[in-house]
Amino acid sequence: MSMNEQMNHAEENILHTYNRFPVMFDHGEGCYLYDTEGKKYLDFAAGIAVNSLGYHYPGYDEALKSQIDKLTHISNLYYNEPMSEAGEKLVKASGLSKAFFTNSGTEAIEGALKAARKYAYTKYGKEAGKYEIIAMNHSFHGRSMGALSVTGTEHYREPFEPLVGGVKF
């Protein structure tokens, strides 16, 4: 299939959630992406910040392949060595007391909102009314209801209102 045929095929079968650029990537190398016609692009977005290590670095690929051969995701209901080691590194680097792992940025935002509310509830009690989340204008944090509630860009928020309350911009 040509690139245009592939893009049309995707439009027929995949829910349209973003305005996409008219390019279809085939593979990546370092900080570059290559489309199906061989054109090279510098990935300034790093896959919307989830590919900050780039693409196909030998050490990265080897570590992923090694882990895939052993075990993939099993949730945080069970213990596993890589998660314990990563948690220790994060605690040491951050100075915080615990690490919290999630599957996505959306879950990280939801976890942060819940942690802030739980902290205020535990420290001050329900009657203190200290539940407000302060959010930034012109921000974007994801597409879940909690993330949209703290997204300070109206055109993302408006179609899904009413959102989670107690947010101040």
Which residues are covered by each model-predicted region?
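Active-site-adjacent loop/helix segments that line or gate small-molecule/cofactor pockets in enzymes
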Residues: 1-29
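Active-site and channel-lining beta-strand-loop segments
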Residues: 23-43
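PLP-dependent aminotransferase-class I/II
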Residues: 136-169
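Short beta-strand-to-turn element immediately C-terminal to the catalytic PLP-Schiff-base lysine
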Residues: 34-35, 53-55, 149-150
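Fold-independent oxyanion-binding glycine-rich loops
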Residues: 36, 44, 104-105, 136-139, ...
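Glycine-rich loop-to-alpha-helix module at the N-terminal edge of alpha/beta enzyme cores
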Residues: 40-126, 132
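Solvent-exposed alpha-helices and their adjacent loops that cap or buttress functional pockets
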Residues: 24-26, 91-94, 125-128, 159-163
